[in-house]
């Protein structure tokens, strides 16, 4: 074991040369009655692994070279090199050494020592949210919009469990997140102590990795490993659970021990093989109707993707997570595909003879009936995570690699003089012309009814007023889909939304996190009345920090997406989807009154009910300094179209109708 450990340390050191190298041992609890075990951890694909199995499953969950930038180093405070300090102060200095500048938090008894230590940091800015779910979504918005890991701190028990939705969201959307939780003192673990929950057990399947620290000397290494794991390979959330007595214990930190991740690092994919890239170029040359299908795995490859499209002329469609990775107003953009994607994007994939899938999961909201998806096409799948290759759709060519490196390699091949003749054969003009006709035949549009405000129109006006430059966060529901269709996205990390988990309440805290990460940027939360209410308390944080977050609520007084399904598939039978005041009997009362609520938080707000009022109201919102809320009252009968029913195929696509019709 000693020899193996020494070898592991050597294998890790080169890969981690640019990272701080703390040390120590970590112990993890398996269950309440089992003895402590050294260095146990769990990952995306494990439940109760042994130590040996753990190192393997970590690597399968998160592989390849880093897809997010290594965090910029923050200046580290000057300290006496041998000075003893509390474990909590060691945690904070470890965060500083990992480049952390912002922490989103909500304090409690088991995490008090960490919060006290944070007040002593000259480097880290602390952002107090009003709910732990809000703080974790804010950390997610920070990470999604910047590429740097977001950090959140919560107490034990309900504080830790309130993080769970956000951890699951980050896990599904591959967002680099480090969550630090307080825990009951070690002697009380397993005794059902006050606010004790086994958060490590809770989060085994929704984190990339997690730790329970049982030795104060482990803190520097574990924090370092947490950031390395969160931001390399396929990014994801990492949880670090720290008992209160560990936070209080005095120790001299050691910053020079290597990380203990030999299994993970040894399985990081190498650069893509040249022969596989040659095969892809050959398939492109043989194709007549190719399509690029781009996901969130391309968020660090925007330039390379645009260059590849320049060289090949292949049309591009994106997933919900891929929005912004290719400019949506580019002539070769087909915008989003899938359940609520454009007709022409879905038509293109249905008729393609070659599908280049880059950084995607082939999830059900895109594929529908998976056997019918891209059934005429040869499929090339490039992804950083080997577990995704062939999981939902079997490719003809699979490449486990960082998409950025794969695109760089293919671009170099296409640019070589020897490939000039081949490039002349890449003439897809007839295919592009066919798709242009579909764009004209099936544009993204909407109907108007007098002075009622179409929600799509409100988003179009916002797009025009902001010139498509805003960072847009959303909740989940109809407004989310309309925001994909009617706003222009030209760059990666401009679009922030809960895609895989579909968590309502995401928009406002995520927008707050994005505003923290991008000072001076225009940040707008396009939200629904139902989704906003789930984390409306974060208006307090936005106001107190005077963040210039604009909130545009598309308020239809209903749970709109569920109402749409009720209209289409349940004979319009309403089952608890009306969110207004039942006593109003549809008498025009807007409930709750978001304008009054915003005023209670000290945030200026306005409401519009007529189409002719929208532009002036949006202009006023965007011109206002600091936060602002605009309540846009829209009809609940609107449907998000196009729509492919769940488990449907392109032939089942719906392009007309709304709640004013019967089905």
Curated annotation (Swiss-Prot):
Q: What's in the keyword line of the UniProt record?
A: Amino-acid biosynthesis, Branched-chain amino acid biosynthesis, Chloroplast, Disulfide bond, FAD, Flavoprotein, Herbicide resistance, Magnesium, Metal-binding, Plastid, Thiamine pyrophosphate, Transferase, Transit peptide
Region entry Thiamine pyrophosphate binding, spans? 478-558
Recite the UniProt cofactor note for this protein.
Binds 1 Mg(2+) ion per subunit. Binds 1 thiamine pyrophosphate per subunit.
Which subcellular locations apply to this protein?
Plastid, Chloroplast
Matching CDD domains: TPP_AHAS, TPP_PYR_POX_like
Keyword Amino-acid biosynthesis recorded: yes
Disulfide bond sites: 152-298
Query: Taking the first listed entry, what is the main subcellular location of this protein, grouped into a coarse class?
Result: plastid
One Pfam family named in its UniProt record: TPP_enzyme_C
BP term (GO), one: response to herbicide
What highest taxon heads this organism's lineage? Eukaryota
Q: Name one GO molecular function term.
A: flavin adenine dinucleotide binding
Q: Does the keyword Membrane apply?
A: no
Which InterPro entries does UniProt cross-reference here?
Answer: Acetolactate_synth_lsu (IPR012846), AHAS_TPP (IPR039368), DHS-like_NAD/FAD-binding_dom (IPR029035), THDP-binding (IPR029061), Thiamin_PyroP_enz_cen_dom (IPR012000), Thiamin_PyroP_enz_TPP-bd_dom (IPR012001), TPP_enz (IPR045229), TPP_enzyme_TPP-bd (IPR011766)
Q: Which pathway, metabolic or otherwise, does it act in?
A: Amino-acid biosynthesis; L-isoleucine biosynthesis; L-isoleucine from 2-oxobutanoate: step 1/4; Amino-acid biosynthesis; L-valine biosynthesis; L-valine from pyruvate: step 1/4
Q: Where does thiamine diphosphate bind?
A: 132
Region span, Disordered: 1-56
Q: What is this protein called?
A: Probable acetolactate synthase 2, chloroplastic
Q: Which organism is it from?
A: Oryza sativa subsp. japonica (Rice)
């Amino acid at each position: 074991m000693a020899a193996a450990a020494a070898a592991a340390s050597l294998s890790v050191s080169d890969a981690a040369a640019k990272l701080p190298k703390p040390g120590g041992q970590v112990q993890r609890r398996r269950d309440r009655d089992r003895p402590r075990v050294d260095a146990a951890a769990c990952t995306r694909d494990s439940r109760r692994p042994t130590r040996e199995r753990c190192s393997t499953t970590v690597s399968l969950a998160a592989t390849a070279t880093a897809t997010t930038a290594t965090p910029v180093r923050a200046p580290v405070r000057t300290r006496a090199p041998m000075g003893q300090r509390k474990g909590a102060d060691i945690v904070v200095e470890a965060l500083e050494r990992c480049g952390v500048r912002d922490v989103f938090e909500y304090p409690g008894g088991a995490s008090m020592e960490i919060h006290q230590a944070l007040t002593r940091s000259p480097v880290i800015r602390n952002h107090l949210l009003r709910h732990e779910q809000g703080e974790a979504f804010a950390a997610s918005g920070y990470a999604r919009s910047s590429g740097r890991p977001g950090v959140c701190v919560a107490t034990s028990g309900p504080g830790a469990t309130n993080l769970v939705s956000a951890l699951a969201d980050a896990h599904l959307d591959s967002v680099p997140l480090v969550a630090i939780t307080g825990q009951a003192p070690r002697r009380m673990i397993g005794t059902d102590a006050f606010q004790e929950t086994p958060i490590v057990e809770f989060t085994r399947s929704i984190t990339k990795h997690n730790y329970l620290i049982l030795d104060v000397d482990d803190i520097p290494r574990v924090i370092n490993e947490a950031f390395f794991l969160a931001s390399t390979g396929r990014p994801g959330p990492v949880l670090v659970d720290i008992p209160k007595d560990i936070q209080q214990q005095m120790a001299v930190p050691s910053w020079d021990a290597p990380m203990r991740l030999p299994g993970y690092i040894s399985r990081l994919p190498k650069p893509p093989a040249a022969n596989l890239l040659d095969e892809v170029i050959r398939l492109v040359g043989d194709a007549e109707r190719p399509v690029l299908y781009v996901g969130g795995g391309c968020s660090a490859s925007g330039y390379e993707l645009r260059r590849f499209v320049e060289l090949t002329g292949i049309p591009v469609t994106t997933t919900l997570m891929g929005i912004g990775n290719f400019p949506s107003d580019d002539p070769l953009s087909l915008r989003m595909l899938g359940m609520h994607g454009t007709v022409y994007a879905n038509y293109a994939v249905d008729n393609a003879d070659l599908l280049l899938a880059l950084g995607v999961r082939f999830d059900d909201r895109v594929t529908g009936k998976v056997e019918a998806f891209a059934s005429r096409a040869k499929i090339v799948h490039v992804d950083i995570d080997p577990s995704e290759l062939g999981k939902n759709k079997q490719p003809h060519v699979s490449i486990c690699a960082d998409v950025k490196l794969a695109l760089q390699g293919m671009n170099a091949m296409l640019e070589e003089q020897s490939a000039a003749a081949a490039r002349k054969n890449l003439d897809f003009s007839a295919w592009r012309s066919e798709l242009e006709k579909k764009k004209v035949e099936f544009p993204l549009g909407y109907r108007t009814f007098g002075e009622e405000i179409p929600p799509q129109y409100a988003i179009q006006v916002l797009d025009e007023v902001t010139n498509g430059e805003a960072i847009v966060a959303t909740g989940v529901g109809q407004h989310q889909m309309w925001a994909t269709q009617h706003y222009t996205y030209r760059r990666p990390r401009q679009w922030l939304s809960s895609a895989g988990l579909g968590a309502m309440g995401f928009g406002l805290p995520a927008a707050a996190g994005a505003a923290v990460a991008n000072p001076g940027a225009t940040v707008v939360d396009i939200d629904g009345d139902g989704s906003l209410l789930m984390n409306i308390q974060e208006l307090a944080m936005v106001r107190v920090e005077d963040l210039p977050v604009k909130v545009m609520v598309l308020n239809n007084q209903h749970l709109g997406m569920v109402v749409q399904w009720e209209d289409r598939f349940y004979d319009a039978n309403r089952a608890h989807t009306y969110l207004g005041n039942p006593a109003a009997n549809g008498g025009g009362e807007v409930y709750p009154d978001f304008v009054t609520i915003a005023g209670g938080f000290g945030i200026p707000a306005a409401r519009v009910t007529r189409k002719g009022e929208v532009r002036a109201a949006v202009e006023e919102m965007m011109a206002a300094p600091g936060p602002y809320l605009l309540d846009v009252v829209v009809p609940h009968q609107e449907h998000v179209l196009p729509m492919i029913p769940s488990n449907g195929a392109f032939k089942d696509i719906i392009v007309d109708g709304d709640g004013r019709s019967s089905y």
